[in-house]
């Protein structure tokens, strides 16, 4: 069968959405600390393929970030 020195191939575990499930944080435009985790160092919204956020929650997140920017809670551009 398998040799003694043979290794299993590496399979990356599929990440789950951090906003679904029990005791998951609610997406709120006033929670700037949470929203800053999903904004890059240049101020752009990080895509869901990197953050593993589901499509529905990514839309909610983008809407909350844009609302927080409009109200002055988050910067548009970080220098």
Curated annotation (Swiss-Prot):
Gene Ontology biological process terms, A to Z: translation
GO-annotated molecular function: small ribosomal subunit rRNA binding; structural constituent of ribosome
GO CC term (a single one): cytosolic small ribosomal subunit
Organism superkingdom: Bacteria
UniProt-listed Pfam families: Ribosomal_S18 (PF01084)
UniProt xrefs under InterPro entries: Ribosomal_bS18, Ribosomal_bS18_CS, Ribosomal_bS18_sf
Keyword set, alphabetical order: Ribonucleoprotein, Ribosomal protein, RNA-binding, rRNA-binding
Task performed by this protein: Binds as a heterodimer with protein bS6 to the central domain of the 16S rRNA, where it helps stabilize the platform of the 30S subunit.
HAMAP family according to UniProt: Ribosomal_bS18
Subunit structure: Part of the 30S ribosomal subunit. Forms a tight heterodimer with protein bS6.
Family, as annotated: Belongs to the bacterial ribosomal protein bS18 family.
Name of the protein this chain belongs to: Small ribosomal subunit protein bS18
Organism expressing this protein natively: Rhodopseudomonas palustris (strain BisB5)
């Amino acid at each position: 069968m398998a040799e003694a020195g043979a290794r299993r191939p590496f399979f990356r575990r599929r990440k789950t959405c951090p906003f679904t499930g029990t005791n998951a944080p609610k997406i709120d435009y006033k929670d700037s600390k949470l929203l800053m985790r999903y904004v890059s160092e240049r101020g752009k919204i990080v895509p869901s393929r990197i953050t593993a956020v589901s499509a529905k929650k990514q839309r909610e997140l983008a809407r909350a970030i844009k609302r927080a920017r409009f109200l002055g809670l988050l910067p548009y551009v970080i220098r």
